[in-house]
């Protein structure tokens, strides 16, 4: 329960910082480890790190479902999956040891298997994000497996 309270507190702090920046019209640069800073346009604004929002929330190997936070190192997720003989089928590229799950999803980069298995976006069942106004928005959600397949 303490981990959940900590995550809720961190999310509230991020939301408040984003609301304040929106009110002041201060640009923010959302970042995890910064491993993809070279990718795309040059980033500007005050850094807002998601690194503290880290950890694997839940993992059901038999259900093939894992819930992780944005700041979770990609290597940590892959090691957890490998311990159960599983992997990320879309083979996300690593741009440094600190690459995070949030960066993987935000950049949408997939490896050579993308053509046959799909991209990272095809494996995301749901997410919660904070928009530019500091509001927490849920998309998708938890799924439960029944005998016919997956249902919300």
Regions inferred by a protein language model and the residue ranges of each:
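Active-site-proximal helix-loop elements at catalytic-domain edges
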Residues: 1-5, 64-69, 116-126
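Glycine-rich N-terminal segment of FAD-binding domains in flavoprotein oxidoreductases
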Residues: 5-95
